[in-house]
Design a protein with these regions (language model features):
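C-terminal motif of bacterial Sec signal peptides marking the signal peptidase cleavage site
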Residues: 15-17
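Feature for extracytoplasmic/surface-facing segments of secreted or surface-associated proteins
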Residues: 25-34, 111-309
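Proline-enriched interdomain boundary motifs that mark the N-terminal boundary
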Residues: 32-42
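Short, solvent-exposed loop/linker segments at the N-terminal edge
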Residues: 45-51
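Exposed beta-strand face motif in extracellular beta-rich ectodomains
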Residues: 53, 89-93, 164-166
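Solvent-exposed segments in extracellular or luminal domains encompassing
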Residues: 75-92
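C-terminal edge beta-strand
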Residues: 104-112
């Protein structure tokens, strides 16, 4: 009996030493819960106002999602929706998904912008560089400013921005003459679907009050010179032809002065300084007389030339 008892004690000792009595080797822990993954994308990163964009999102290890940023509400763990933003600007669309393993978020950006159509006019000017100058240096800053080229009818479509809408160079369709360094512009004071760039809008941009352009040049008050196409509407023998003729007179004056000064100084200056000088002289004469200014008189031309030199 004592020998059997000794065997039993020895067996218990061996079992205990091997961990058989309930040590750590016999148990198991549960695996960690996987965290969610989330992805979101747009069919386009930029659209014109009024267009739509498709948004797609998906997730894994998630039980529910919530839209954040420029959209809102509870969302399925994956899906597709069509969005039509109601305004312009930069929008951020986010999605946050959660599950037993926590939550994850992702987002994507969208630019919504307007476009404006327009025409470059002396006669119509084809092949002109059209751009929106945002820093008033009268040159296009590639990559920072919107630009395009006028087509064979002088027309263009450009991404709208605040600034100075400029037409530079090109070919005059009425005469076939190249317009080297011929720069005309319109200061953009607000969005409209159609803009014209003409010698008249160029002078207006340099007046003390651009809205006085009709009064100072005697243009009929019913004409909006910033949206009215003087070429398309000429031929009535009346107010439309008068507007067209004023544009031609301003072109001849500014272009002639530019060529004279460039030849004297051996430079390649564009016409904006000459339109500016014309506007300054118009302001001076109108402030004195409160009458429309005759830009064809020799005194007017000499005063403009003196302002430049």
């Amino acid at each position: 009996m004592s020998r059997n008892y000794l065997y039993l004690i020895t067996l218990i000792f061996i079992i205990t030493s091997c961990g058989g009595g309930g040590g750590g080797g016999g148990g198991s822990s549960e695996p960690p819960v996987a965290a969610p993954t989330v992805s979101i994308s747009l069919s386009s990163s930029s659209i014109v106002l009024g267009e739509s964009v498709t948004i797609n999102w998906s997730s894994s290890n998630a039980t529910g999602c919530t839209a954040t940023g420029s959209w809102s509400g509870s969302k399925a763990t994956s899906g597709t929706e069509t969005l039509t933003p109601s305004g312009v600007g930069f929008f951020n669309y986010g999605i946050s998904c959660s599950g037993s393993g926590g939550s994850r978020s992702s987002s994507v950006g969208l630019e919504v912008y307007r476009q404006t159509d327009g025409v470059s006019v002396d006669g119509y000017i084809r092949g002109a560089e059209i751009f929106i100058d945002k820093n008033n240096n009268f040159t296009v800053d590639v990559g920072d400013e919107n630009s395009t080229t006028s087509d064979n009818d002088g027309k263009f479509t450009i991404k709208y921005d605040d600034g100075n809408l400029i037409s530079l160079g090109g070919i005059d369709l009425d005469t076939g003459n190249p317009l080297d360094n011929f720069l005309i512009n319109q200061n953009l004071s607000g969005y409209s679907e159609f803009k014209v760039i003409t010698p008249v809008t160029s002078v207006a941009s340099f007046l003390n009050d651009s809205t006085s352009i009709n009064n100072v040049l005697g243009i009929d008050s019913s004409i909006d010179v910033f949206t009215f196409d003087p070429v398309a509407n000429k031929g009535d023998g009346g107010i439309n032809d008068y507007l067209y003729e004023k544009g031609n007179q301003l072109t001849i004056l500014a272009f002639s002065l530019q060529n004279i000064i460039n030849n004297i100084n051996v430079t390649t200056e564009t016409t904006q300084d000459y339109f500016k000088s014309i506007a300054e002289e118009i302001d001076l004469e109108y402030e004195t007389t409160s009458q429309k200014v005759d830009i064809e008189t020799s005194n007017f031309v000499l005063n403009v030339l003196n302002n430049i030199t």
